[in-house]
Amino acid sequence: MSVTSTTPNPSGSADPPDGFDEIEASKAPLIDHLIELRQRLIYALVGVAIGFVICFTFATQIYNILVWPYVWANNGQKVEMIFTNPPEFLFTKLKLALFAAVFLAFPIIAHQVYKFVAPGLYRNERAAFRPYLVATFLLFLLGAGVVYFIVMPLVMKFFLSMQIHSDDVQIQLQAKVSEYLSFIMTLILGFGIMFQLPVALTLLARAGFIGGQQLRDFRRYAIVAITGIAAVLSPPDPFSMIAMALPTILLYEAGIWRVDWVEKQRTAKAAAEAQQPAG
């Protein structure tokens, strides 16, 4: 009779059976995740496509709405815009329709993101994740609103003040439809991204990467960084850069307040758990 001796696994876990392949075992869950991702992307793209059709149908009306800051800066008088290439206005409307469609379909996109991420989160994490999706959209809308109602009218007022009307020379602004759209879209995207700062800081605080005191100590460097980023994201004029940087600095201060709140919540939760009897 032969005796087969086995060496115990020092980790305390059973050895995998012969022929076991960890890569093969993980393939099925990975494929399931990829299938789920594909499905969510399809739903999101369908939402964008439907929004694109709707927005392209009303592209001229949407463009007229975006021209309002220009009209206001021109003292309410009718403005004349030009296009110098036959298909230019068509391509401008296509670009505008896609831009507006993403806005219109954002609730669908956010819902699909949540559906994809939620299965990997605990219940309390899912409850904490949803407000961030809503806050992201609302802060982007806030940034777009600041551009539309404050920044863009003042910027256009400044540029129109550079026109020259004299007996010898007439220099006046004749904005191209494509360039005006690119200008206002750049501002909206730039402000929308910069206005996400409180959300980003709060998420970093929840993950334990930053604290309120760290943000206070880093404030002077943050102001320099915000100014530099605003110079990159905003159009190349000082007024736009300042108009983007100042609200973002205020949002940085709001982010500090939010991070302090997160830290207080964490401390209160830890104290409550410490007071609970063991077992």
PLM feature spans:
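Membrane topogenic/interface segments and analogous intrinsically disordered interaction regions
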Residues: 1-279
